[in-house]
């Protein structure tokens, strides 16, 4: 018997992955080999006709008395249907008829918002975690296409209807699906030779060092790897991306590389970036190995009060602003709890406070010395720093980083060139 069901909370596994990765094949395989478990399934598809749900229904047609299929169409689990998802899971959990719940997410959603649904408190203080236990986040990737898709310039519709734009880059979606997973299944292993599989494995491990990465073909994978694993933990998941783990690590070298040449490197400096020189860096063709992922915080001279968040996946750099540096906030407005205060002071500098450049780069064949020189060139010179914030506002290309350009595609686009 599944432990969560015995304890009164319905255990849940969420299946994510891009369209065609093999989520439905995996779901069908689980339902065919569920070892007598009474399973409820929530399927989400963006189309009018939910073909994925129909295929699952055929597989469980002999067990309709014990299995329940719920279709959630015309929306996305991670955003527009969050309220519906809460209601559906709550209803299933209260029935106490099922041992397990499987959720197949749409191909254009990422796992983290689904996970946050379980921690969400409604207006009456109710949390879904009182009735259901999120057990495992599983991401399925097409091993035969994953590297090519990372290089794609294609865009997909955004699941997040409140975002700045209605589309996002495919590479960005794929990486987020990988970064926020407990288990990553490399599907179509039978179509990949051993060096190809190891190369994909190395990339995935660089993007998410804490995930369990396993090969899969035709949905065949041990049920114990997906159900009742107890791998999910929200704080740990939030810190699972490789870029974040590298940024927070204090006992590892600035640059690390494994046998397949996947390097993670952190750029740290305490001077602001010049907007024009930074923009030139972001727009120029990339010739320094193969850049897989970069993300982190930046300090821009023309917006010196604000914390910049720079993110790259595939061939696209994007930026946003996520609040003010604590250096420009009155101490009376600082957090009171010791844990958060320690976090602020851990990044504190006696001259510029917490203002900083802290960018993580993950890639293959990266020459970090070249990257260091290029980024150093983007910093303000001593003379420019001495001119002060008023002069910084008038620096060339300052408007390129205004709010209107938060999701703008740099022109010409960044060109990631594989080694």
Swiss-Prot record:
Pfam families according to UniProt: cobW (PF02492), CobW_C (PF07683)
UniProt-recorded name of the protein: Zinc chaperone P47K
Leader sequence segment: none
Family recorded in the similarity comment: Belongs to the SIMIBI class G3E GTPase family. ZNG1 subfamily.
UniProt superkingdom: Bacteria
CDD domains attached to this UniProt entry: CobW-like
Catalytically driven reaction(s): GTP + H2O = GDP + phosphate + H(+)
Motif CXCC motif in this chain: 76-79
Keyword Ubl conjugation assigned: no
A molecular function (GO) term: ATP binding
Function: Zinc chaperone that directly transfers zinc cofactor to target proteins, thereby activating them. Zinc is transferred from the CXCC motif in the GTPase domain to the zinc binding site in target proteins in a process requiring GTP hydrolysis.
EC main group: hydrolase
InterPro entries for this protein: CobW-likC_sf (IPR036627), CobW-like_C (IPR011629), CobW/HypB/UreG_nucleotide-bd (IPR003495), P-loop_NTPase (IPR027417), Zn_Chap_cDPG_Synth (IPR051927)
UniProt EC number: 3.6.5.-
All copies of domain CobW C-terminal, residue ranges: 262-379
Organism encoding this protein: Pseudomonas chlororaphis (Pseudomonas aureofaciens)
Residues the entry annotates as binding GTP: 17-24, 79-83, 187-190
Keywords, comma-separated and alphabetical: ATP-binding, Chaperone, Hydrolase, Nucleotide-binding
């Amino acid at each position: 018997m599944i432990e969560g069901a015995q304890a009164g909370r319905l255990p849940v596994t969420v299946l994510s992955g891009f369209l065609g990765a093999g989520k439905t094949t995996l779901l069908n395989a689980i339902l065919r080999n569920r070892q007598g478990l009474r399973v409820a399934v929530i399927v989400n598809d963006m189309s009018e006709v939910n073909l994925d749900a129909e295929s699952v229904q055929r597989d469980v047609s002999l067990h309709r008395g014990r299995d329940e299929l719920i279709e959630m169409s015309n929306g996305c689990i991670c955003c527009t249907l969050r309220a519906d998802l809460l209601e559906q899971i709550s209803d299933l959990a209260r029935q106490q008829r099922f041992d397990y719940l499987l959720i197949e997410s749409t191909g254009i959603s990422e796992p983290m918002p689904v996970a946050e649904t379980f921690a969400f408190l409604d207006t009456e203080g109710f949390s879904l975690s009182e009735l259901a236990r999120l057990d495992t986040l599983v991401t399925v990737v097409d091993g035969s296409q994953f590297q090519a898709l990372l290089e794609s310039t294609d865009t997909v519709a955004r699941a997040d209807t409140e975002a700045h734009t209605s589309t996002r880059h495919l590479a960005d979606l794929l990486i987020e699906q990988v970064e926020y997973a407990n288990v990553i299944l490399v599907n179509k292993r039978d179509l990949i030779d051993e060096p190809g599989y190891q190369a994909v494995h190395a990339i995935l491990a660089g993007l998410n060092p804490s995930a369990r990465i396993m090969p899969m073909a035709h949905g065949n994978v041990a049920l114990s790897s997906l159900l009742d694993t107890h791998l999910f933990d929200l704080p740990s998941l939030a810190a699972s991306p490789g870029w974040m783990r590298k940024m927070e690590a204090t006992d590892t070298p600035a640059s690390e590389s494994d046998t397949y040449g996947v390097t993670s490197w952190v750029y740290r400096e305490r001077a602001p970036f010049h907007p024009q020189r930074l923009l030139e860096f972001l727009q120029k063709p990339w010739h320094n190995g193969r850049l897989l992922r970069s993300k982190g915080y930046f300090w821009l001279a023309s917006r010196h009060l604000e914390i910049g968040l720079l993110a790259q996946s595939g061939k696209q750099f994007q930026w946003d602003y996520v609040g003010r540096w604590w250096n420009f906030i009155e101490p009376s407005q600082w957090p009171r709890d010791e844990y958060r205060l320690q976090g602020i002071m851990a990044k504190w500098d006696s001259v510029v406070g917490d203002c900083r450049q802290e960018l993580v780069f993950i890639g293959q064949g990266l020459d970090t010395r070249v990257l260091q020189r290029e980024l150093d060139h983007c910093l303000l010179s001593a003379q420019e720093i001495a001119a002060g914030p008023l002069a910084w506002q008038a620096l060339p290309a300052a408007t390129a980083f205004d709010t209107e350009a938060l999701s703008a595609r740099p022109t010409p686009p960044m060109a990631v060139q594989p080694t």
